[in-house]
Every structure is written in structure tokens, then in C-alpha cells.
Design a protein with these regions (language model features):
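Extreme N-terminal starter segment of soluble prokaryotic enzymes
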Residues: 2-8, 200, 224
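N-terminal beta1-alpha1 ligand-phosphate binding loop
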Residues: 5-28, 207-208
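Short glycine-/small-residue-rich Rossmann-like dinucleotide-binding loops
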Residues: 14, 50-52
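Structural signature of beta-strand start/N-cap positions in the alpha/beta core
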Residues: 30, 45, 78-80, 148
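Short acidic low-complexity segments
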Residues: 31-42
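Short acidic/histidine-rich motifs immediately flanking catalytic phosphotransfer sites
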Residues: 40-50
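Cysteine-nucleophile active-site neighborhood
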Residues: 52-128
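Amide-donor transfer/coupling interface in amidating biosynthetic enzymes
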Residues: 108-229
Length: 229
């Protein structure tokens, strides 16, 4: 793609848009701040950022974003979900059981257990929220094996096994071995830190706060062919 990719920055009212817009612009995107759901058409890339509560994101879906985002997710345009933008791909979250997400990915969003043990390096008790730098294990060239990214979250995405699959457990698979889990991180337990399915990439961490690794990821996302995302 020779010209700067025309990139929709979806405004769900969840904050941090300016930081994401700056990072995308620095990575080579032609960023369009999108506050109207009906305008989500004809873009080269779509980015759905967010920090805050699942309930607030679900309210934005009910206010008009649900249908356009589902249409985009079923299309061919590469889409990047960040933090709450990843969690909203699921139907429900323990953070707000009454709120309804997109239900595009199978499973639900769960809270980290209260007792996560101790940090193996410092011996200090691991806390919730999980806040700070963490390393990824991944086979994705976009994400980068061993790269460190910045996380701030109390909830993680737990992918559900497909009916009839041989995944362990009755209904919920070990998300770190689910085919859609593109990267794993560890905070007292292994959890899925990124999802990839077709042109969709969703990350629990914040690329815009992750310095060189985040900038590299955004550049790769903007340059990648749709099927490579």
C-alpha cells in the first residue's frame, strides 16, 4: 500500500483517543476520528481503542455502534481492537454481567483471581489490576516473539471451546491453546494477550503506551495484507 492507509479511529467515548491517534499517525496512518457509526465505510484500516469499563463500551454499542462494527468484523478490512476494544468482541464480562458485547468471539471476559501468588523475580504479591510491562509468547510476526508491551487491566478474555472440540474442560478451553489466541502473557497465570482471526487483530495491551514495540506493531498492522493480520 503506497499511500498512507486511511484509518478509522472509532470513538466509543472510552478515552485515550489522542494518544492512539498520535501513535497511528507516527506509524504512517491517515487517521480519521470517527464519532458517527454510519460513517464506518470505505476505510483501509479500522482501529477500536478503549480504556475503562466494559459497561461503558457496551453502552456505546447500544447507542449505534453494534451493527456497523459487526458488519466490519464480518468484512475484509483489517481491524485492530485495543484493550476494551478486544474485550467488547465477546458477549459478556464478569465486570458487568448485564451488559452485552458484540458476541463475535466465543467465550467471555473474566476477572483475574484475587490470589495470583507472588512475582517470581521480586517475591512481592501479584496485584490486580495487572499493570506494567509484560512479555509475549507468540508465533505472530506482527506481535514479535519475546516483545514487551504495556498492560493495564483487571479482566482477561477467556475463549470458549467450539462444540465437539477436544479442548480440555467442559465448556471453556485453555485460552492460551485456542486457535484464535495469537499471543500469551503471564500474570500469576497464563492468559491470552492477543487474538487473531482473518483480518482481525485484538490486543489486551496498549500499543500506544508500549514505546518501540508498540510503534513497530502499529507499522506492521498498517502495512500488512489483510490475510496476514
Amino acid at each position: 500500500m503506497s499511500a498512507a492507509p486511511r484509518t478509522a479511529l472509532v470513538d466509543l467515548g472510552l478515552g485515550n483517543l489522542h494518544s492512539v491517534a498520535r501513535s497511528l499517525g507516527a506509524a504512517g496512518a491517515d487517521v480519521v476520528h470517527l464519532a458517527e457509526p454510519a460513517a464506518l465505510k470505505g476505510f483501509d484500516r479500522i482501529v477500536v481503542p478503549g480504556q475503562g469499563a466494559f459497561r461503558d463500551g457496551a453502552a456505546a454499542l447500544e447507542a449505534g455502534w453494534r451493527a456497523p462494527l459487526l458488519e466490519a468484523l464480518h468484512g475484509s478490512t483489517p481491524l485492530l481492537g485495543i484493550c476494551i476494544g478486544m474485550q467488547l468482541l465477546f458477549a459478556e464480562s464478569e465486570e458487568a454481567p448485564e451488559a452485552r458485547g458484540l458476541g463475535f468471539m466465543p467465550g467471555r471476559v473474566r476477572r483475574f483471581p484475587r490470589d495470583l501468588g507472588r512475582d517470581p523475580k521480586t517475591g512481592a504479591p501479584l496485584k490486580v489490576p495487572h499493570m506494567g510491562w509484560n512479555q509475549l509468547r507468540t508465533a505472530s510476526s506482527l506481535l514479535g516473539e519475546g516483545a514487551y508491551y504495556y498492560f493495564v487491566h483487571s479482566y482477561f478474555c477467556d475463549l470458549e471451546a467450539a462444540p465437539g472440540s477436544d479442548a480440555p474442560g467442559d465448556t471453556v478451553t485453555d485460552s492460551t491453546r485456542h486457535p484464535a489466541c495469537a499471543a500469551v502473557a503471564h500474570h500469576g497465570m497464563a492468559f491470552c494477550a492477543a487474538l487473531a482471526q482473518g483480518p482481525l487483530l485484538a490486543v489486551q495491551f496498549h500499543p500506544e503506551k508500549s514505546h518501540q514495540a508498540g510503534a513497530r506493531l502499529l507499522r506492521r498492522f498498517l502495512l500488512a495484507e489483510a490475510e496476514a493480520v
